[in-house]
Structure formats: C-alpha cells, structure tokens
Amino acid sequence: MRYLVRISFLEALMFPKPKPALTPNTYAYESEPMVKPTGFREYDARWLLGSEINLMGVQALGMGLGTLIHELGVKPEIVTAHDFRSYSASVKMALVSGLMAAGCKVHDIGLAITPMAYFAQFDLDVPCVAMVTASHNDNGWTGVKMGANRPLTFGPDEMTRLKDIVLNARFEPRAGGAFNFIADFPERYIADLTKRPKLKRRLKVVAACGNGTAGAFAPRVLEAVGCEVIPLDCELDHTFPRYNPNTEDMKMLHAMRDEVLRTKADVGLGFDGDGDRCGVVDNEGDEIFADKVGVMLARDISAQHRGAIFVADVKSTGLFMTDPVLKQNGAKTEYWKTGHSYIKRRLNEIGAVAGFEKSGHFFFNKPIGRGYDDGLIFALAVCDMLERNPTKTMADLKNALPKTWGSPTMSPHCADEVKYKVVDAVLKHFQDLQRRGGKVAGQEIRDLVTVNGVRVTVADGTWGLVRASSNKPELAVVVESPVSEARMREMFKAVDAVLRTHPEVGEYNQTI
C-alpha cells in the first residue's frame, strides 16, 4: 500500500502545467491539462467544457483547490456535489481525483442543488465545499462554486491565489486523500427544511424548474409544508427542452405566468439550474423582479425584527432606501457588490438578517437560515409572508410598494479580456461628467455608487447601472425610475449611448 501511495505522489509531482488552449481530438488534448485563465472569475469558476477546459484541467483545478485548502490551514475535508447536466458527474469525479491527490478527504453527496452542498457543510461538520455547477449558464458550460469557511464562498483573494496555483502548477501532493459517498443525503436536507409547522393558509403554488436539478426537490419541499403544488417542467432533462432554467430569463417567467393564470394559483416560484435562486410570478401573472420581492420580504421581516439590517446588490431597486414602511420599521439597507460571495460575506460582516440580489439570490441569517443563498428557503419565506397576510394576495403586497419602473438585467456581449477595462472607462466618463456639472438623461448627477461598476443617479431619482458580469463574457445594465416609464427609457438610452462608444460592446441578450 505504501508503494502505491508513493507512486501517486510521483505522478502528482510530475503533473503537467496547464496549457491555456489545446485543440480537441488530438494527442495533446488527451495528454495535457487545459485551463483557460479567464475561467477564474471573481468568486467562482466557469468554463465552456471542451473548448476552455478539459478533464485533465479539472484534475489540475482539484489539485490546486486541495493545495489552497492546506495553505489556508483548514481541516482538509470537503463536500462535493454536482448539478444535473450530462457531463457534470464526469467533471466532478475529475475534480475529486485532484482533491484526493492533494490529500483531501472528500464527502460526496452526489446529485444536488447548490444550497444542499452548503447545508452539508453544517450537517456533516465539514469546512470546505466544491459544487460542480454552471448555475444558470447555458448547456456547454461547467464550473465550480467553492468555499473553505462556511457559510462563505471564495472571493477575489482566494480565486486569485487558486488561479496562480493551478496555472503555474504549484501543486503540493499529500497523503491522506480519501473518498466517502453519503447515500440519500437529499433526505437530510429536505427534513431540515420541513421540520417546521405546516402552513395554515392553503396556498396553490406553481413550482417551475426548467427541467433542472431543483425539479427533484422543490415540489417535495413545498408539498411537505402544506402547499398545493402544480409542477411545471420539473422532470429532469439536461437538454433543457423548453428554456434554460434561469430565473431572469423572460421565457421561463412567461411560462410561469401562463401556468399561474391557467391554474389560478396564488404564486409562481421558479428555480434556476442549481437551486440557489428563485423567481416569482404573482397571482395576476405579473413577473415580480427579485429586488422588488426583496423589498416585500424586508417589510415582512422588519415588522417582526424592528431595526433589521439588510444588504442589497447594486443592481437592486432604490426602494430599499426610500420605502416608507421600511423607514417606519427602522430597517437599514446597505448596497453592496453584485455576486453571491460578496453578499454572503457582507451579510455576515455586518450581521444583516437577510440579503437580496436582483438576479434572484436571497440570503438569510438566523433565525431564518444559516447565511447562505437557498432558493427553497426563499420560497418558504414567500409562503410565510403570504400566511402572515391572510387577506392579501401576492399582487396586493406587490401593489402596496411605491411605484417604480425598472428593467430586467440586460447583458450586452463583451469579451472577458476587455469587459473590466470597458467598465472602468464608463466609470471615468461619468466621474468626469459629474465634475464638469454635466447632465445624464437631461438631469444633473445626484450620486455615483462605484462599489461595483458604476450606478449613476440623477436629480429625480432615476438611475442606471453598468457593471461587468462575473460569470459570462458580458456586461450587466439595469435602469430604474421612480417617475415614469419614459424616464426609465431615457436613462437606458443615455447609458447605452456611452456603451456604444466602445466597439468591444456587442448586442444585448434582451432590452426594454
């Protein structure tokens, strides 16, 4: 046995340095690791499988992650899991082989949604996590969400170090690697979510999963707490035949709308590909952007926890600062960088009760959650909010908010290699304009928020945001006005005009 372990050490020590590109269907592609450097994002990793990373590259990633875990001085034990795509299990096992070569004990929970892997860190008392998922990205993408300090996930510092270890083959192979499969782990997760009183209000809920991973779990959880569940595209099918399971995708939201209206449901709840995000359609079939649902939940939570602190990402509505009910409840909200790792970290740093992202990530600290994002915990929070308002519909609660006109997240293509330079140039443009007393959409600049890209707010409260996507070769553009739809469109026109001065910026995935 000692001899066999020693051989594995030598093999690991000789593991080749990853190449940034290799040609598929060649000897080199099957004999060397390939890892495109741009796949290391701000707080997780994403690649197109085959053209940007191969399985040997994933092995290198696992060895690098294991090396980093030892560097951080954390107990070298890690939860692994994978989402429902045709290739995710293979990617995970390549990752596992690298982790084991680096001396990590792997606790694999199999097919899972991302929050189930986060829960496993607590339930199994394991400090680290590696969830193989491309989240809401289209088929062809793969990636890994990682953490070594529950409930937090990696941020830029850890990702920068991991990138250096992997791309420069700074691996440190160790003894002690092992693999342990945890059978039937989803039952433990579902039991944890449902060990609570059943709802007294009988809610009819459309559960939409886009044929993604959440389809195996979301209907069961909602039924267990007393909902009448109408499943929509909950059969697992990794070809995603109807639409990509993405809660910001208008195709998914429109399918939810149609089913809510057809069945006269109280609410539609849609889950993304790895179950850490959730989108909402009200009983009248209107899609409610996640940031507006966040304001509704903040009202509900702050009524029970006066003076509650919340975190919202910079893409979110201005109502978190101006809503009279939140002010009356003594609630405070801090705008922070977009990204699940950033919001999670800030939530825990300032002791916020909950955090909200326009993309549909919702984070709950005690007494609601454990500090991580979980689409199912959010779904239960929506059901609880409806129960606490027995005479109100979801539409009633939405219509009680001050009126604003806002856009979805609009994403023009921009290559990973240049997107941050473009955003820096846009930021400088608005800073220079503010110094000169210039106008945007016909009004003077009242405020610039630069914590993540640039959010420019003018005198009447209308604002526009430009930031770089952390997950795709895209920018993210959002606009909102508390005045009128026309003012919202004027702001978009003004922001887009600045972007069009940069030829690197391509077509949008959707516009208003």
PLM regions and their residue ranges:
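An N-terminal, well-structured beta->alpha segment
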Residues: 15-97, 101-102, 182-205
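Phosphate-binding and adjacent anionic-ligand microenvironments
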Residues: 305-478, 483-512
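Glycine-rich phosphate-binding loops at beta-strand->alpha-helix junctions
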Residues: 83-91, 209-216, 316
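Glycine-rich phosphate-binding loop
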Residues: 126-141, 260-282, 287, 331-374
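N-terminal small/polar loop signature for handling phosphorylated ligands or for N-terminal nucleophile
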Residues: 67, 75-141, 220-281
